[in-house]
Every structure is written in structure tokens, then in C-alpha cells.
Design a protein with these regions (language model features):
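Eukaryotic acidic, serine/proline-rich intrinsically disordered low-complexity regions
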Residues: 1-8, 12
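Tandem repeat scaffolds
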Residues: 7-8, 16, 20-234
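Residue-level signal for secondary-structure boundary elements
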Residues: 18, 29, 245, 259-262
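Conserved N-terminal substructure of TIR/SEFIR domains
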Residues: 23, 256-266
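Short linear loop/turn motifs
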Residues: 32-34, 248-257
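Structured, non-catalytic alpha/beta "coupling" segments that mediate domain-domain communication
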Residues: 228-251
Length: 266
């Protein structure tokens, strides 16, 4: 449960709060479950704070420091539970922050630093992550319609992530794990691949594969070729390091089998 003194001090304004944090660096503020809706917390010093289950709907947290902050289960989104609109976290430092199971639907996280952040089970539907730094972030979560354009996703864990209709154009996906992810309708124009894990996923409905830049070979499973029914550009596969024998012999076989399976029965 939140420390009410901490809560009241924060509500008086960022200037006094930041002075308190500077003078009492040993204190880890307990703001868990607090009602912090619609506050102006721009540039607030919230590193190490416990904000789990807090209601931050409509709160402006742009450029706030949230390094190692605990936001598990926090309400950040515009929705029925928090009626104050989505929080603004643009440019915020959320390095190593815990956001597991947090509702971040529609939240502005553009240019935010989320290096190593824990986002398992979080809802990031329609979230704005434009140019966000998600290096080595755990993103096994819902990212439907999210804007990840030009985001740094190098080394990120996106296994089983729902990236339906997500915008990944220009995103850095080197070393990212996309195994079992749903990329239906995803936009990959000018994305960067290299040492990217593409196991057991369907790439047939993703757009822009022919414009992807390859910094090196990636890992593409045969299961991905079958699930995609061979509907992956040859140039993409070749640049990703798929052996020429696979392109010459296995890929045509997969494509023919797919055509036969959809042919009308006479």
C-alpha cells in the first residue's frame, strides 16, 4: 500500500518532489496503488519507485526518470478503469523498469528508453513506440497496431508477441527473437535484420520483406517456410542466409504443395 506522505508530496509538484529525492536518495518511494491520474509529472525523478497497480491515466510522464521503477499492473491506458486518457511517457527513461501485465494501450512511448525492461503480458495495443530504445527488452506481449517505426529492438525477445498490423518500418531487429510471433499485416519496410530468429512464423502476410536491410545472416526455420507456404521473396531469403539448395529445390516444392492444397476439387 502506498505511503500517503509520498503520494501527497508528489501531488504538490515535481520541483519539491525532485528536491526530496535528491536529499533522500536512500528512499525508495512507495506509490503502489495510488491515484495519480491527470498529474503533470514531466521530468519527475521516479527511479526505483514502486508504482505497481497505480492509476496513471492521463498523467504526463514525459522525460520522467523511471529507471528500475516497478509499474507492474499499473493503469497507464485510456479505458474504462482509468477514464482520464492515456499517459504520456514520451522520452521517459524506463531502463530495466518492470511493466509486466501493465495496460499500456495507446500510450505515447515515443523516444522512450526501455532498455532491458520487462513487458511480459503487457498490453501495448496501438502504443506509440516511435524511435523507442527497446534493446534486450522482453516483449512477449500484445503489440497489435503498435507504432514501432525506427525503434531499436536489437536483442529484444518478441517470441509469441502479437504484432498484427504493427508498424516496424525502419526498426532495428538485429538479434531479435521473433519465433512464434504473429506478423499478420505487419509493416517491415526498411527494417534491419541480422542474426534475427524467425522460427515457426508466417511471413506471407507481412509487407516490405523485399526492402529489408540485412546486416548479416538470420535464422529462418524450415517451419517458417512451410507456414508461409513459400510466400517469401527469394531475395529476402537469400540475403538472410538461406542455402541456395533450399531456394532451388525445397522452396518450389513447398509452393507447389500450397497451390495444390488450395486448388478447387473437381
Amino acid at each position: 500500500m502506498a505511503n500517503q506522505e509520498n503520494v501527497e508530496l508528489l501531488k504538490t509538484g515535481v520541483t519539491g518532489w525532485n528536491e526530496f529525492r535528491k536529499e533522500h536518495q536512500e528512499v525508495s518511494p512507495d506509490l503502489s496503488g495510488a491515484d495519480l491520474r491527470s498529474l503533470d509529472l514531466r521530468r519527475a525523478a521516479l527511479s526505483g519507485a514502486d508504482l505497481s497497480e497505480a492509476d496513471l491515466g492521463g498523467t504526463d510522464l514525459s522525460e520522467a526518470e523511471l529507471v528500475y521503477a516497478n509499474l507492474c499492473g499499473a493503469l497507464l491506458a485510456e479505458g474504462q478503469e482509468s477514464r482520464s486518457g492515456a499517459a504520456n511517457l514520451s522520452g521517459a527513461d524506463l531502463t530495466r523498469a518492470a511493466l509486466a501485465d501493465a495496460d499500456v494501450t495507446g500510450v505515447n512511448l515515443s523516444h522512450a528508453k526501455l532498455i532491458g525492461a520487462e513487458l511480459r503480458g503487457a498490453k501495448l495495443l496501438r502504443a506509440n513506440l516511435f524511435r523507442a530504445d527497446l534493446t534486450e527488452c522482453n516483449l512477449c506481449c500484445a503489440l497489435n497496431y503498435a507504432n514501432l517505426s525506427y525503434a531499436n529492438l536489437s536483442g529484444a525477445n518478441l517470441s509469441r508477441a502479437d504484432l498484427t498490423d504493427a508498424r516496424l518500418n525502419g526498426a532495428n531487429l538485429t538479434g531479435a527473437n521473433l519465433s512464434h510471433a504473429d506478423l499478420s499485416g505487419a509493416h517491415l519496410e526498411d527494417a534491419v535484420f541480422g542474426a534475427t530468429i524467425l522460427a515457426d512464423i508466417d511471413l506471407s502476410d507481412a509487407s516490405g520483406l523485399d526492402t529489408v536491410h540485412h546486416s548479416g545472416p538470420s535464422s529462418i526455420g524450415v517451419d517458417t517456410l512451410y507456414r508461409s507456404q513459400g510466400q517469401i521473396p527469394d531475395d529476402f531469403l537469400r540475403a538472410a542466409g538461406v542455402p541456395e539448395e533450399v531456394l532451388l529445390y525445397l522452396l518450389p516444392l513447398i509452393r507447389r504443395r500450397a497451390q495444390v492444397s488450395v486448388a478447387p476439387q473437381g
